[in-house]
Amino acid sequence: MKFAVIVFPGSNCDLDMYHAVKDVLGEEAEYVFHTETSLEGFDGVLLPGGFSYGDYLRCGSIAQFSPIMAEVKRFAEEGRPVLGVCNGFQVLVEAGLLPGVLMRNRDLKFMCKTVDLVVENNETMFTSEYAAQETIRVPIAHGEGNYYCDDATLAALKANGQIAFTYKENPNGSVENIAGITNEAGNVLGMMPHPERAVEALLGGEDGKRLFTSIVKWGARHVTYN
């Protein structure tokens, strides 16, 4: 597969995302800057963490208007994989590609540690390499990761199997311990934890690697190469 790593002003996890898919998995990857207007030739889109546009107004609220985001929306509408991690999740929510909102952490503090996640749905293109209800360890690093949605949206997320990951112990106040969700079609995933920081034993664990291998295995079945 060929991945586009989207780079906004203030992104700081783009190098990690690139390393995960290019160096660890051996897939093709290129940086695509926020000013671009085409994703031609790419099979997957990765929106990394960081502080896009300085997180002014709200996290991700300015990045949603970047020229590349119109193409990301079209890409998602075609059913192709879009992954947003941390600030990338915030951008996807602000852009309307995922429901809900991400607010300040419950304790109003930036949190940086490794947490236990539970795989709630292993039947998505992002989670097929995990076991259902498996516990994995993945780092978090955020100040605004407190996921919230109204009751109707929460009921829909549950009914449609859109809750991909939950926290075993809630670090930030997220409703129902939610750590990551997909869109209804299942091809857009947003999550606050950083799987790209858990792809090598040298970094303390490889539990995040299987998220990327899940995408690649989906690509092997669905992507047609010329």
From Swiss-Prot:
One Gene Ontology cellular component: cytoplasm
Locate the active site: 86 (nucleophile), 194, 196
Q: Which SMART domains match?
A: GATase_5 (SM01211)
Q: Which GO terms describe its molecular function?
A: ATP binding; glutaminase activity; phosphoribosylformylglycinamidine synthase activity
Domain Glutamine amidotransferase type-1: residue ranges = 3-225
Q: Which domain of life is it from?
A: Bacteria
UniProt keyword annotations, A-Z: ATP-binding, Cytoplasm, Glutamine amidotransferase, Hydrolase, Ligase, Nucleotide-binding, Purine biosynthesis
- Its Enzyme Commission number(s) read 6.3.5.3, 3.5.1.2
List, alphabetically, the PROSITE patterns matched: GATASE_TYPE_1
Which compartments does it reside in?
Answer: Cytoplasm
> Which InterPro entries did the record assign?
Class_I_gatase-like (IPR029062), PRibForGlyAmidine_synth_PurQ (IPR010075)
- Catalyzed reaction equations: N(2)-formyl-N(1)-(5-phospho-beta-D-ribosyl)glycinamide + L-glutamine + ATP + H2O = 2-formamido-N(1)-(5-O-phospho-beta-D-ribosyl)acetamidine + L-glutamate + ADP + phosphate + H(+); L-glutamine + H2O = L-glutamate + NH4(+)
User: Could you state one GO biological process linked to this protein?
Assistant: 'de novo' IMP biosynthetic process
Pfam families on file: GATase_5
Classification via NCBIfam families: FGAM_synth_I (TIGR01737), PRK03619.1 (NF002957)
Q: How does it assemble?
A: Part of the FGAM synthase complex composed of 1 PurL, 1 PurQ and 2 PurS subunits.
Described by its record, this protein's role is as follows: Part of the phosphoribosylformylglycinamidine synthase complex involved in the purines biosynthetic pathway. Catalyzes the ATP-dependent conversion of formylglycinamide ribonucleotide (FGAR) and glutamine to yield formylglycinamidine ribonucleotide (FGAM) and glutamate. The FGAM synthase complex is composed of three subunits. PurQ produces an ammonia molecule by converting glutamine to glutamate. PurL transfers the ammonia molecule to FGAR to form FGAM in an ATP-dependent manner.
**What protein name is recorded for this chain?**
Phosphoribosylformylglycinamidine synthase subunit PurQ
- Which organism is this entry from? Exiguobacterium sp. (strain ATCC BAA-1283 / AT1b)
Write the gene name: purQ
